[in-house]
């Protein structure tokens, strides 16, 4: 199972940049590859802040699915996720509905899942290299702070912003605490961290 990264430098001005990107993204999906489009300027070689998603990125699972299975509501949570994927409900509504189904789950289950998270191949080495070169590293996730903080401690990361599950008497209440971290909130948090670290937004990944 070989993984590789290839950099292609293209000169000139595309006749239709958006169409070129669409075609490459289709190829990305067909071949299970990732593409990143970057302007070849001074900032490209001077990145200082890198932000990661967590579920199915740093870890090879969706934590809410793992929690749902342990709570005996796996099928119900999956059905809500599918409704959201079809656009029938938005992320925030689907998030609240799924979290509500976790009510009563013992916090010890979260601890067990955290200590057995399947870390994506190469992540440990990547974090070591990024820290060695002085990058600030953040997790911005629609997942849960409990697991984000576990990874923060494990790899020595700088920031974690995710959703906090409310816990009372050692059990989940089926509610969350604070603002939901969705796509819009992630963009706001990226800008916030960049300001705190005095990093130009062009120097972020």
Which residues are covered by each model-predicted region?
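C-terminal cap/substrate-recognition subdomain and adjoining C-terminal extension
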Residues: 22, 104-205
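A broadly conserved amphipathic alpha-helix scaffold signal in soluble, globular proteins
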Residues: 25, 65-69, 128
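Active-site neighborhood of HAD-like aspartate-dependent phosphohydrolases
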Residues: 42-92, 96-97
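Cysteine/selenocysteine-centered motifs that mediate thiol-based redox chemistry or coordinate metal-sulfur cofactors
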Residues: 88-109, 113
